[in-house]
Curated annotation (Swiss-Prot):
This is Lipoyl synthase 1, chloroplastic. It comes from Populus trichocarpa (Western balsam poplar). Binds 2 [4Fe-4S] clusters per subunit. One cluster is coordinated with 3 cysteines and an exchangeable S-adenosyl-L-methionine. It is an enzyme of class 2 (transferase). Pathway: Protein modification; protein lipoylation via endogenous pathway; protein N(6)-(lipoyl)lysine from octanoyl-[acyl-carrier-protein]: step 2/2. Its main location: plastid.
Length: 376
């Protein structure tokens, strides 16, 4: 689920530091058993995305390359995607704090290209934090995501909600994004733990604005209710890609209609709730398919949409089909706002937890609260 949000004060990272592999082949084979077992499509001119086949598993736990993985030598990474290595005093402070409190952030776990800019505050000095709760190991194996996976991850840390709130309070941020791995192993999908974290933050710092980037909770709308009524300000859940590519890009337990159902329910469950989603580009989608997805999202009242370039974490992940130009991203922003989205963040390095537009979203939250109060 993880991988692509807006936030005010911003630091996104993931604590575990990967050890360098002994060799390229051993790294590829041991990367992630769940992900290696994900769909491996037969070579053909047409792919049946509704009935993917399961790849064979090597004796060492690795998986073979599928027809949608590997590097495409004809698709070169453009200059506009090249980033400097993260550094800076603020970056070091945030990293140390997260390690000390045993907290995870999606910035490091998902290899986000914006980690340096977010943690240091960018040109406007606004730092954005994106904390990842429920551990650092996902029960799903989406083929675009760098977060590690397991069928039976460790149980959630009961101290995580309080530690997260203490960390955020000490940083002095006023807009925080909380995301999580998928936890299909938990009865409520982790929604109760998620809600505890939000409440702990609001108790320590009532004025802080909280955005939650959630899983689909297996379509459990009661779990959605639990989180929506926890005190959060923005409910975010990513559809990730267009309808046709869902079974190729995402874990089979995820789905386009299921994600729409979650977003729709969050919107109607609480008056004034702001909803948000994200779409990756460069996976082989057509312009018409993107427009259809945008129309579906507007039909259920989604307020905020982000577009970003899909970047392949390793050769075992989905191949980049296209590097979309900054000009095309600008087009999608203009088009999205013309059809009614209240805000669209669109750019090659934009991610669902990216720090773009935090001031705008903060103002939007305040306006929505006032409108809801006036109606009631």
């Amino acid at each position: 689920m993880i991988e692509q949000s807006l936030s005010k004060p911003s630091f996104s990272l993931s604590i575990p530091i990967p050890q360098p592999p002994k060799s390229k082949s051993s790294f590829l084979c041991s990367y992630s058993k769940i992900r290696c077992e994900s769909v491996d499509y037969p070579s053909s001119s047409k792919i049946d995305a509704k009935h993917p086949q399961i790849s064979s598993i090597n004796s060492n736990g690795g998986g073979k390359m599928g027809s949608y993985t590997g590097r495409d030598p004809n698709v070169k990474k453009p200059e506009w995607l090249r980033q400097k290595a993260p550094q800076g005093e603020r970056y070091d402070e945030v990293k140390e704090s997260l390690s000390r409190l045993k907290l995870n952030t999606v910035c490091q776990e998902a290899q986000c290209p914006n980690i340096g800019e977010c943690w240091n505050g960018g040109g406007d000095g606004i730092a954005t934090a994106t904390i990842m709760v429920l551990g650092d190991t996902c029960t799903r194996g989406c083929r675009f995501c760098a977060v590690k996976t397991s069928r039976n991850p460790p149980p959630p840390d009961p101290m995580e909600p309080l530690n997260t709130a203490l960390a955020i309070a000490s940083w002095g941020v006023d807009y925080i994004v909380i995301t999580s791995v998928d936890r299909d192993d938990l009865p409520d999908g982790g929604s109760g733990h998620f809600a505890q974290t939000v409440r702990a933050m609001k108790e320590l710092k009532p004025e802080i604005m909280v955005e939650c980037l959630t899983s689909d909770f297996r379509g459990d709308l009661k779990a959605v209710d639990t989180l929506v009524h926890s005190g959060l300000d923005v409910f975010a859940h990513n559809v990730e890609t267009v309808k046709r590519l869902q079974r190729i890009v995402r874990d089979p337990r995820a789905g386009y209609e299921q994600s729409l159902s979650v977003l729709k329910h969050a919107k109607i469950s609480k008056k004034g709730m702001i909803t948000k989603t994200s779409i990756m580009l460069g996976l082989g989608e057509s312009d018409n398919e993107v427009k259809e997805a945008m129309a579906d999202l507007r039909a259920i009242g989604v307020d905020i949409l982000t577009f970003g370039q899909y970047l392949q974490p390793t050769p075992l992940h989905l191949t980049v089909k296209e590097y979309v130009t900054p000009e095309k991203f600008a087009f999608w922003k203009e088009y999205g706002e013309s059809i009614g989205f209240r805000y669209v963040a669109s750019g090659p390095l934009v991610r669902s937890s990216y720090r773009a537009g935090e001031l705008f979203v903060k103002t939007m939250v305040k306006e929505s609260v006032k409108e809801a109060a006036a109606i009631s």
